[in-house]
Amino acid sequence: MASYFDEHDCEPSDPEQETRTNMLLELARSLFNRMDFEDLGLVVDWDHHLPPPAAKTVVENLPRTVIRGSQAELKCPVCLLEFEEEETAIEMPCHHLFHSSCILPWLSKTNSCPLCRYELPTDDDTYEEHRRDKARKQQQQHRLENLHGAMYT
């Protein structure tokens, strides 16, 4: 009579491997059970998700610019239509100009300029913390590169 393992074409499991797997599962369960459901939002990987919309107060306070003379030749980067003289355009902090009917729907979905990706503040505290962490890491990397560059000069 063939053994169970021969009959099912498998190998007996390694008890040590099984113990490690069970320990990892128990660790994951205990961590998950101690997490508050609000903390689960902190697990979001913002580098692979769309950023939240721009803060409503920031969007409302964006400067409105009246198009004058030479600016009338400029085009809205979203719809590619030229601005009319005396028309009011919204100016982003990066100084790009847009028709309000073009940029307002965009900013209601994401917080960045469609041209240069300049980011406006959001109402999402988790995302803002992610932005601050990302900026700190970039500053740290920059200081480290400068330190390495200055080491032998």
Swiss-Prot record:
Short name of any one Pfam family annotated for the protein: zf-RING_2
Catalytic activity: S-ubiquitinyl-[E2 ubiquitin-conjugating enzyme]-L-cysteine + [acceptor protein]-L-lysine = [E2 ubiquitin-conjugating enzyme]-L-cysteine + N(6)-ubiquitinyl-[acceptor protein]-L-lysine
Modification after translation, per record: Autoubiquitinated as part of the enzymatic reaction.
Gene3D superfamilies: Zinc/RING finger domain, C3HC4 (zinc finger)
Tissues expressing this chain: Widely expressed, with highest levels in liver and heart and lowest levels in brain and skeletal muscle. Expressed in platelets (at protein level).
A cellular component term, taken from the record's GO annotations: cytoplasm
One Gene Ontology molecular-function label: ubiquitin-protein transferase activity
Single biological process term from Gene Ontology: protein autoubiquitination
Domain of life: Eukaryota
Region (Disordered) location: 127-153
Stored SUPFAM superfamilies: RING/U-box
CDD domains xref list: RING-H2_RNF181
Enzyme Commission number: 2.3.2.27
Record-linked SMART domains: RING
Database matches in InterPro entries: Znf_RING, Znf_RING/FYVE/PHD
Modified residues (Phosphothreonine): T153
Keywords assigned by UniProt, alphabetized: Metal-binding, Phosphoprotein, Transferase, Ubl conjugation, Ubl conjugation pathway, Zinc, Zinc-finger
Zinc finger (RING-type): 76-117
Pathway it works in: Protein modification; protein ubiquitination
Subunit structure: Directly interacts with ITGA2B and, as a result, with integrin ITGA2B/ITGB3. There is no evidence that integrin ITGA2B/ITGB3 is an endogenous substrate for RNF181-directed ubiquitination.
Annotated function: E3 ubiquitin-protein ligase which accepts ubiquitin from an E2 ubiquitin-conjugating enzyme in the form of a thioester and then directly transfers the ubiquitin to targeted substrates. Catalyzes monoubiquitination of 26S proteasome subunit PSMC2/RPT1.
Family, similarity comment: Belongs to the RNF181 family.
Full protein name: E3 ubiquitin-protein ligase RNF181
Taxonomic placement: Eukaryota, Metazoa, Chordata, Craniata, Vertebrata
